[in-house]
A protein has these predicted regions:
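A structural signal for conserved, well-ordered secondary-structure elements
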Residues: 1-735
């Protein structure tokens, strides 16, 4: 929606007739979660957020990215039906006196049938205005919708039906009445949805398993909509108040700026790779191009919506792909320096780089899969892009570039040693000897973060997190988003960034603006907009809750905790417990400090920055694992003090760490310089994250591993060699 626009439905939640209490915040949250579940199957990247105390706003993205396109009326009709149905399913037995004559007498007041009720059949739109068919039912509900455990649409002989499964009392009651009336060729049961009859049943036999079928003149769309709604019933009655289309959240200019920034970033990255790796850098660009083509191709095949969070995933994917190539080329540089032939050097470089690439990308993939499983909304969109990106990155780095090198080597087109521009080669810096200095820097940054967040508190949070006041008004002819934003800024001085959205009623030509401002400022902004002549007629105002709240916040938190837990287990399994402590500590260190610096620089924490922080987390763990892989390799093959071996490993990966950071920074700085205001906060946070992540992979992660192993008296070399021994088959021999 931030890149394509969409359609917005504003729902009023009304209590059901039998409800005694007014709509509560719990009712609102339950309705939000139910509608999300209903729409997930038919609409991707749907946003459902609370508005006021008894409303919900549902945003559906356009599929083509054209906010002015003609809306697919069939799809809108399907969504409208899903939004308005409470989907309360009730099954009644028909009354013994069920016949048109008796029903007519009851309606005219000429007769009374105790313990009965009249129900009408649901009417198709084409039959509206005609007298509906009716049945006389027993007053007591036979089976309630709460007993439904499954509902699925299926096609049988060209007719669409719905199969329902009941448990508990529903299953028991269905078994009893079906046995009693089995074989009676008379309508004995009516199935009601939201008080209207959708089907009437004749029992052809005993139903002991709790399954029944609803048949009627359903289209495929109607059957699917009913099945989804029955699986997710609502305890309230939703009513559509407004139905409007809206343009992209990011203006077309911002989108174009983002595209230009991406082109600049890729161009500068290509230039950078060619300078440092020369001919090998050109091969890497072939792999990177294949990576990007495959990524966007797969996203298009699965019709995944591309969002700002998706851009974050693409940036991290490009960083990971470049890192894989840098790892291979740094190994290739070492093998060529050792005097090996081109063919042998290429083979050895890929073999030695494989474990670092595999472990680094698998840990990032674990994070993406956990987010995909547990998270929602924009975070899930990030996870989809990143998951696909990691898989294609492995393919392009390990297969595409290797095929190119092998072909060139086999055809003798590449028979001279490859040349590279040396970067920080043969350095012997005592990084672990600088632990006191790095500890001081980290502690100082953490203290600054704590003080900044402690002082600013809710001031550091955007409207998505804390809620605020919402204004809604018809725009005057002279009104524009820029005018409204300027008026709000001048009125409130230092304020949270207002959220302004332009809306157009479906089928109408008027312009409506929806404005979200910080809590308690609605009345002041309302007066300012009126005085400025930006509104026609009355301005509606109400309080709104946070967009990131309730179930979404909990699921995202669970996803984060689960992701950290799985990474911890994987690193422990692949390396050793001390390494897992170092990896998680460095990751938390990076995120905490980046959040602190971002807030200190006056940025608001919002959904855009959530995507940036996820990118930073992926980059941080990837960077750390690469260093750990070299430490593990050196501990296997070198003798001497563990501290010296760890220093040697960090120095050996220093050029790779710096080069990967620089190539990633090139892309992100391009976004900062050319991406426009919309991408400013996003790119700023990632720049800080890359710098902090580079620092922590050198000065934080490895020193923590060494400190923990020393404190717990763990022999890192012995632990790693023992793990290797466990992996050796019984028939293998060692020297």
């Amino acid at each position: 929606m931030d890149l394509a626009g969409g359609v917005r439905f504003t729902l009023q939640l009304n209590k059901r007739a039998e409800a005694k209490e007014p709509i509560s915040s719990k009712d609102q949250e339950e309705a939000l979660n139910v509608l999300k579940k209903r729409l997930t199957g038919s609409v991707s990247n749907v946003d459902v957020v609370p508005e006021g105390k008894d409303r919900l706003v549902v945003d559906i993205p356009h599929e083509t990215g054209d906010a002015n396109q003609n809306i697919d009326e069939d799809k809108i009709k399907q969504i409208r039906a899903q939004l308005q149905k409470s989907a309360i399913l009730e099954l009644y037995l028909t009354h013994e006196q069920n016949n048109p004559v008796t029903i007519g007498k009851i309606e005219r007041g000429e007769d009374v049938v105790p313990f009965s009720k009249i129900a009408e059949y649901a009417q198709p739109e084409e039959e509206s205005g005609e007298e509906p068919r009716k049945l006389l039912l027993k007053e007591e509900i036979l089976i309630k919708g709460e007993d439904v455990t499954a509902a699925n649409a299926f096609n049988e002989n060209g007719r669409w039906k719905i199969n329902i499964t009941f448990e508990g009392d529903g299953k028991k009651n269905l078994a009893e009445v079906s046995m009693k009336y089995a074989g009676d060729n008379v309508t004995k049961m009516a199935i009601l949805l939201d008080g209207e009859i959708i089907s009437a049943a004749v029992f052809s036999g005993h139903i002991p398993g709790g399954n029944c079928q609803i048949s009627g003149d359903f289209t495929q769309q109607e059957a699917n909509t009913l099945a989804v709604s029955m699986r997710n019933p609502l305890g309230v009655k939703p009513e559509i108040l407004y139905e409007e289309s809206f343009p992209p959240t990011l203006a077309n200019e911002a989108i174009n700026q983002g595209i230009r920034a991406g082109i600049w970033g890729l161009g500068l990255t290509a230039f950078f790779m060619a300078i440092f790796y020369r001919f090998a850098g050109l091969i890497a660009l072939i792999g990177l191009s294949m990576n990007i083509i495959l990524l966007f191709g797969i996203l298009a095949i699965f019709q995944a919506d591309f969002t700002l969070a998706g851009i974050a995933g693409v940036i991290l994917t490009i960083g990971i792909a470049i890192d894989a190539n840098v790892l291979i080329f740094e190994r290739l540089r070492e093998e060529m320096a050792a005097g090996k032939t081109v063919g042998i050097a290429i083979q050895t470089a890929y073999e030695k780089a494989f474990s670092a690439i595999f472990d680094a990308q698998i840990t990032t993939l674990i994070t993406a899969l956990v987010l995909l499983w547990l998270a929602e909304g924009a975070i899930q969109g990030f996870a989809v892009t990143l998951t696909i990106g990691i898989i294609v990155s492995l393919f392009s780095a390990l297969l595409v570039t290797r095929v190119c090198f092998n072909w060139l080597s086999a055809t003798r087109k590449l028979n001279k040693p490859l040349k590279f521009t040396p970067v920080l080669s043969n350095k012997k810096i005592n990084f672990l000897g600088l632990t006191k200095f790095s500890r001081f820097i980290s502690v100082a940054l953490i203290v600054v973060t704590i003080l900044t967040i402690g002082i600013k508190k809710e001031e550091s949070l955007g409207i998505e997190f804390v809620g605020g006041d919402q204004l809604r008004f018809n725009a005057s002819e002279s009104a524009s988003i820029e005018d409204i934003k300027k008026t709000i800024t001048e009125t409130l001085n230092e304020t949270k960034t207002p959220q302004i959205q332009k809306l157009t009623p479906i089928g109408g030509d008027s312009t409506i603006y929806s404005v979200r401002v910080e809590p308690g400022s609605g009345e002041k902004v309302k007066q300012a907009i009126t005085i400025a002549g930006l509104a026609e007629g009355q301005i509606q105002s109400q309080q709104i809750g946070s967009v990131i709240a309730g179930e979404m916040a909990k699921r995202s938190l669970y996803a984060l905790i689960a992701g950290l837990g799985v990474i911890f287990i994987y690193v422990t399994f692949r390396f050793e417990f001390s390494f897992a402590i170092g990896a998680i500590a460095a990751l938390i260190h990076d995120l905490f400090i980046v959040i602190g610096i971002t807030v200190l620089c006056g940025k608001e924490l919002n959904l855009i920055l959530v995507g940036a922080f996820l990118t930073i987390a992926g980059y941080s763990i990837n960077d750390t694992i690469v260093v750990f892989d070299r430490i593990r390799e050196n501990l296997r093959s070198q003798r001497g003090d563990v501290k010296d071996i760890m220093n040697t490993a960090i120095n050996a990966t220093l050029s790779r760490t710096i080069l990967t950071s620089l190539t990633t920074l090139i892309t992100v700085v391009s976004l900062l310089l050319f991406g426009g205001p919309a991408l400013n906060d996003f790119s700023f946070a990632i720049i800080i994250g890359v710098i902090v992540g580079t620092y922590s992979s050198i000065f934080v992660a490895s020193p923590i591993v060494y400190w923990w192993a020393k404190k717990k008296k763990v022999n890192l070399r012995r632990e790693i060699l023992d793990a290797d021994q466990d992996d050796i088959s019984p028939t293998a021999t060692t020297n």
